[in-house]
Amino acid sequence: MSFGFPTFSQNRFTEQYSGLCPIAPGRGAGLQPCRRDCPVARWLVADHPVFGSDCRCRMMVGVNRVRIGRHELTGA
């Protein structure tokens, strides 16, 4: 299913921080993983290098645009 968002290969920012995503673990050294299972691979979770640890989840919608808050589909 496609949600119309950039894939990891299309989004350099997402690739850089893909270790934060539960689907692509292991590359975000020092960042805490999210405990939720998100069905959308574009979610980055836990500490964000810009916004800090108060931001629990965010969805990448562009190279430098970060949407912060609840998941539009699951409400998580």
From Swiss-Prot:
It catalyses: L-lysyl-[protein] + acetyl-CoA = N(6)-acetyl-L-lysyl-[protein] + CoA + H(+). One of its GO terms (cellular component) is host cell cytoplasm. It is an enzyme of class 2 (transferase). The keyword Transferase applies. It comes from Mycobacterium tuberculosis (strain ATCC 25618 / H37Rv). Its main location: secreted. Is completely inhibited by anacardic acid, an inhibitor of HAT activity. On the 2D-gel the determined pI of this protein is: 9.47. Histone acetyltransferase, which by binding to the host chromatin, may manipulate the expression of host genes involved in anti-inflammatory responses to evade clearance and to survive in the intracellular milieu. Acetylates histone H3 at the 'Lys-9' and 'Lys-14' positions. Transmembrane segments: none annotated. Its EC number is 2.3.1.48. This is Histone acetyltransferase. It comes from the Bacteria. It is found in: Secreted; Host cytoplasm; Host nucleus. One of its GO terms (biological process) is symbiont-mediated perturbation of host cellular process. Coiled coil: none annotated. One of its GO terms (molecular function) is histone H3 acetyltransferase activity. Induction: Expression of this gene marginally increases (1.5-fold) in macrophages from 12 to 24 hours post-infection, and does not decrease up to 60 h. Physically interacts with histone H3 in infected macrophages. Keywords: Acyltransferase, Host cytoplasm, Host nucleus, Secreted, Transferase.
